[in-house]
Amino acid sequence: KPNIIIPNIAVHIRRGDVNENNEKRYTTNDQYKEILSFLLEKYPYDTITIFSEGKIDDFHELQQERVHFKLNDSIEESFHSLVTAKVLVMAKSSFSYSAALLNQNIVYYIHFWHKPLKNWKIL
Protein backbone atom coordinates (compact mmCIF):
# COMPACT_ATOMS: atom_id res chain seq x y z
CA LYS A 1 0.00 0.00 0.00
CA PRO A 2 1.37 3.46 -0.83
CA ASN A 3 2.68 5.75 1.90
CA ILE A 4 -0.08 8.36 1.89
CA ILE A 5 0.16 11.54 3.91
CA ILE A 6 -2.88 13.62 4.76
CA PRO A 7 -1.56 17.16 4.77
CA ASN A 8 -3.06 20.03 6.71
CA ILE A 9 -2.60 22.27 3.69
CA ALA A 10 -1.71 20.86 0.26
CA VAL A 11 -0.48 23.14 -2.49
CA HIS A 12 -0.18 21.68 -5.98
CA ILE A 13 2.38 23.45 -8.17
CA ARG A 14 2.25 22.36 -11.78
CA ARG A 15 5.71 21.94 -13.26
CA GLY A 16 7.33 19.40 -15.56
CA ASP A 17 5.26 19.92 -18.70
CA VAL A 18 4.76 23.69 -18.22
CA ASN A 19 7.15 26.60 -17.80
CA GLU A 20 7.12 30.40 -17.76
CA ASN A 21 6.67 30.45 -21.55
CA ASN A 22 3.13 29.09 -21.12
CA GLU A 23 1.35 31.86 -19.19
CA LYS A 24 -2.10 30.25 -19.31
CA ARG A 25 -0.90 27.15 -17.48
CA TYR A 26 2.03 28.50 -15.43
CA THR A 27 1.90 30.19 -12.04
CA THR A 28 5.20 31.75 -10.97
CA ASN A 29 7.02 30.99 -7.74
CA ASP A 30 6.54 34.66 -6.81
CA GLN A 31 2.77 34.19 -7.08
CA TYR A 32 3.01 31.05 -4.96
CA LYS A 33 5.13 32.95 -2.43
CA GLU A 34 2.20 35.37 -1.97
CA ILE A 35 -0.22 32.45 -1.64
CA LEU A 36 2.01 30.79 0.97
CA SER A 37 2.22 34.03 2.97
CA PHE A 38 -1.57 34.26 2.96
CA LEU A 39 -1.96 30.62 4.04
CA LEU A 40 0.68 30.83 6.79
CA GLU A 41 -1.08 33.86 8.23
CA LYS A 42 -4.62 32.46 7.90
CA TYR A 43 -3.68 29.02 9.27
CA PRO A 44 -0.95 29.82 11.84
CA TYR A 45 -0.85 26.34 13.40
CA ASP A 46 -0.81 24.27 10.21
CA THR A 47 1.97 23.10 7.95
CA ILE A 48 1.95 23.33 4.18
CA THR A 49 3.01 20.51 1.88
CA ILE A 50 3.86 21.42 -1.70
CA PHE A 51 3.28 18.70 -4.29
CA SER A 52 5.19 19.16 -7.53
CA GLU A 53 7.87 17.91 -9.88
CA GLY A 54 11.49 19.00 -10.11
CA LYS A 55 14.37 19.66 -7.74
CA ILE A 56 14.17 21.42 -4.39
CA ASP A 57 16.39 24.17 -5.86
CA ASP A 58 13.56 25.00 -8.27
CA PHE A 59 11.58 26.23 -5.25
CA HIS A 60 14.26 28.02 -3.21
CA GLU A 61 12.13 31.16 -2.74
CA LEU A 62 9.31 29.06 -1.27
CA GLN A 63 11.41 27.26 1.33
CA GLN A 64 10.58 28.31 4.87
CA GLU A 65 9.54 26.96 8.22
CA ARG A 66 6.21 25.10 8.11
CA VAL A 67 6.55 24.44 4.36
CA HIS A 68 7.46 20.91 3.27
CA PHE A 69 7.96 19.45 -0.19
CA LYS A 70 6.82 16.21 -1.83
CA LEU A 71 8.55 16.26 -5.20
CA ASN A 72 8.38 13.65 -7.95
CA ASP A 73 6.12 11.32 -5.95
CA SER A 74 3.80 8.86 -7.63
CA ILE A 75 0.70 10.30 -9.23
CA GLU A 76 -1.50 8.05 -7.10
CA GLU A 77 0.06 9.15 -3.80
CA SER A 78 -0.01 12.83 -4.73
CA PHE A 79 -3.61 12.65 -5.94
CA HIS A 80 -4.78 10.91 -2.78
CA SER A 81 -3.02 13.52 -0.62
CA LEU A 82 -4.65 16.37 -2.56
CA VAL A 83 -8.09 14.78 -2.25
CA THR A 84 -7.79 14.25 1.50
CA ALA A 85 -6.08 17.54 2.45
CA LYS A 86 -7.87 19.73 4.97
CA VAL A 87 -7.05 22.70 2.73
CA LEU A 88 -6.19 22.34 -0.97
CA VAL A 89 -4.70 25.00 -3.23
CA MET A 90 -5.17 23.93 -6.84
CA ALA A 91 -2.80 24.50 -9.72
CA LYS A 92 -3.96 25.38 -13.23
CA SER A 93 -4.35 21.74 -14.14
CA SER A 94 -7.00 19.11 -14.74
CA PHE A 95 -5.13 16.87 -12.28
CA SER A 96 -5.64 19.47 -9.52
CA TYR A 97 -9.18 20.15 -10.65
CA SER A 98 -10.09 16.45 -10.42
CA ALA A 99 -8.65 16.23 -6.91
CA ALA A 100 -10.51 19.40 -5.91
CA LEU A 101 -13.82 17.96 -7.13
CA LEU A 102 -13.33 15.04 -4.73
CA ASN A 103 -11.95 17.07 -1.82
CA GLN A 104 -14.70 17.60 0.77
CA ASN A 105 -12.85 20.28 2.70
CA ILE A 106 -11.59 23.78 1.86
CA VAL A 107 -10.47 24.35 -1.75
CA TYR A 108 -8.69 27.44 -3.06
CA TYR A 109 -8.98 28.01 -6.80
CA ILE A 110 -6.51 29.83 -9.08
CA HIS A 111 -8.35 31.12 -12.14
CA PHE A 112 -7.98 29.09 -15.35
CA TRP A 113 -10.24 27.52 -17.99
CA HIS A 114 -12.07 25.08 -15.67
CA LYS A 115 -14.73 26.93 -13.68
CA PRO A 116 -14.77 26.80 -9.87
CA LEU A 117 -17.49 25.21 -7.79
CA LYS A 118 -19.61 27.65 -5.77
CA ASN A 119 -18.11 26.62 -2.43
CA TRP A 120 -14.48 27.07 -3.54
CA LYS A 121 -12.52 30.13 -2.46
CA ILE A 122 -11.01 32.21 -5.27
CA LEU A 123 -7.39 33.32 -5.00
Task: Label each PLM-derived region with a short phrase.
Residues F38, Y43-I122:
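Donor-binding and catalytic core of enzymes assembling or modifying cell-surface/extracellular glycoconjugates
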Residues K1-Y43:
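Secretory-pathway luminal glycosyltransferase catalytic domains
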